[in-house]
Regions:
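Glycine-rich catalytic cores of cysteine/serine-nucleophile enzymes that process amide/ester linkages
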Residues: 3-68, 93-102
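Alpha-helix C-terminal capping segments
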Residues: 57, 66-70, 113-119
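A structural motif
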Residues: 70-92
Length: 147
């Protein structure tokens, strides 16, 4: 499977988010495959789209970093069937600013949804930048263990 991290700077919200997180990323999508037109079939939770959803997207490399990640596509689709349509976690978004605020367990931010689809524990703890770091560590550990 693949994970796409948004590094675009088009919207003020994206610039502020990446600035606050002290990293290049403001959003993340799980890439579940590609359609016949070559667009990525992505799953995440999006403020613009109102929550958890599947969306076909063009992942322009100028705006997205796409990395490989271990995980089960079947498990990701099962998670989506259970949670698709769940709202965006605005409280969790504020949690990026002040972790003590917590999050709404019935709603999701992008990184939380992607982490959970990948089978990672405590997905609510991740923001896009920390999820990128965790996946890089997880993948490098798997390579080292296989050597």
């Amino acid at each position: 499977m693949q994970v796409a991290f948004y590094k675009g700077r088009k919207r003020l919200f994206n610039r502020l988010t990446s600035w606050w997180l002290r990293g290049p990323y403001s959003h993340v999508e799980l890439v579940l495959g590609y359609d016949q037109a070559g667009q990525a079939i992505c799953a995440s939770s999006s403020m613009m789209d109102g929550g958890v959803r599947v969306k076909h997207m063009t992942l322009n490399p100028d705006h997205w970093d796409v990395v490989s990640a271990s995980g089960s596509a079947d498990a990701a689709w099962a998670w989506l069937r259970k949670h698709e349509g769940a709202g965006y976690d605005y409280l969790g978004l504020l949690g990026f600013v002040a972790r003590a605020i917590g999050h709404d367990k019935s709603r999701f931010v992008c990184s939380e949804a992607v982490a959970e689809m990948l089978g990672m524990a405590d997905g609510w703890r991740f923001d896009p930048c920390s999820l990128y770091a965790a996946l890089a560590w997880r993948e490098s550990s798997a390579v080292a263990a296989a050597a």
